[in-house]
A protein has these predicted regions:
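Basic helix-extension-helix modules of the SAP/HeH family
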Residues: 2-87
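Short, structured beta-strand segments at or near domain termini in extracellular proteins/domains
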Residues: 298-312
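Acidic glycine-/aspartate-rich tracts in secreted/extracellular proteins
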Residues: 139, 152, 206, 260-263, ...
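Short, P/G- and charge-enriched loop/turn segments at secondary-structure junctions
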Residues: 97-101, 122-124, 288-293
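A short glycine-rich, aromatic-capped structural motif
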Residues: 102-159, 175-180, 252
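Functional-site microenvironments in short loops/helix caps that host divalent-cation chemistry
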Residues: 119, 161-289, 293-298
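Feature responds to low-complexity, polar/acidic, surface-exposed segments characteristic
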Residues: 7, 42, 155-169
Length: 313
């Protein structure tokens, strides 16, 4: 008798858990988070559309994306793992894929974070993420101004006057933006906020280091120890403070909103990275801050990500 295919069993388990824990409205949100159109999924019931979603992402080798979103929404559910080294899950970027590109609408430089396993969290759990892009820098005042002007969105209250930022702060991270503000920016740009896992992999690479540059504290970032007491231009500490992938300011300068909630109650959103207002301990890449999605602070900003599959080089 042939033994059962473990991946098929995992797919069945995944489908059952998604149907059990996600309502129809939550499935719509899940599709939005994944950059997919709910209406374009095959079928006309929650069950058939869930099946279609799994099949679509499986064909593209992107089931880890679905699992990451499911874990973010329902962290207490025992989700199956597909990070078993199978070829479908370990898809390399096609030959000739650039390491970076300039996102046309925003002007942000996006860096490729290659697919693979990495050590995650304080406990250094082995996790897998597919290819994705992340902004090299936090979104600056100049970047954010394009969004404000384009759709008439309300400008940040800190530093901006008459709807404009001070010219000397053009290349500083935009601050005093709520989680809802930055989600609106990402939607306008056709991008996303990073999940906790995406943010952390981009910040520490694969080896589980404590800071973007290594395991030991170094004065390579704008934290409380620097004594500046305000934001600095993005990349001010580059290249010494850069992450293994070239991301800047992932320790210090401003805390960054992620798309992840602290828990399934969805009352507080996770902040990562520390800021000029916080010390070296709070600027480790595993440190988790949190706040309500309506709050705005002059030490909190954000950066954005893009799913690899939506770009064709």
């Amino acid at each position: 008798m042939t033994s059962a295919d473990p991946n098929r069993q995992k797919l069945t388990q995944l489908r059952k858990l998604l149907i059990q824990h996600f309502s129809l409205d939550e499935l719509r949100v899940l599709c939005f988070d994944l950059g997919l159109e709910y209406e374009e999924l095959p079928g006309d019931t929650r069950t058939t559309k869930m099946h279609g979603l799994i099949e679509y992402l499986q064909r593209r080798g992107e089931l880890p994306r679905l699992l990451n979103e499911a874990v973010d929404h329902r962290p207490n559910v025992a989700w199956p793992s597909f990070s078993d080294g199978s070829a479908a899950m370990q898809k390399d970027a096609p030959a000739g894929t650039p390491k970076s590109f300039i996102h046309e609408k925003t002007g942000l430089e996006m860096l490729l974070i290659p697919a693979g396993e990495f050590l995650y969290g304080e406990e250094k759990e082995l996790k897998f993420l597919p290819n994705f892009w992340i902004a090299k820098t936090p979104v600056t005042n100049a970047h954010y101004a394009k969004f404000v002007v384009d759709i008439g969105y309300k400008p940040p209250v800190t530093w901006w006057e008459n709807g404009k930022y001070p010219p000397k702060l053009a290349n500083h991270p935009v601050v005093s933006v709520s989680w809802y503000d930055v989600v609106a920016y990402a939607q306008w740009a056709g991008l996303q906020l990073p999940t906790e896992q995406q943010w952390e992999k981009a910040a520490r690479g694969q080896d589980g280091r404590e800071y973007p540059w290594g395991n030991e504290w170094r004065p390579y970032c704008n934290t409380l120890e620097a004594g500046i007491g305000a934001t600095t231009p993005v990349g001010y500490y580059s290249p010494f403070g850069d992450s293994p992938y070239g991301c800047v300011d992932m320790s210090g300068n401003v805390c960054e909103w992620t798309y992840s909630w602290v828990d399934e109650k969805e009352k507080f959103c996770v902040l990562r990275g520390g800021s000029f207002f916080e010390n070296q301990e709070q600027s480790r890449v595993t440190y988790r801050g949190d706040d309500g999605p309506n709050y705005r602070f002059d030490f909190v900003g954000f950066r954005v990500t893009a799913y690899f599959s939506i770009f064709d080089f």
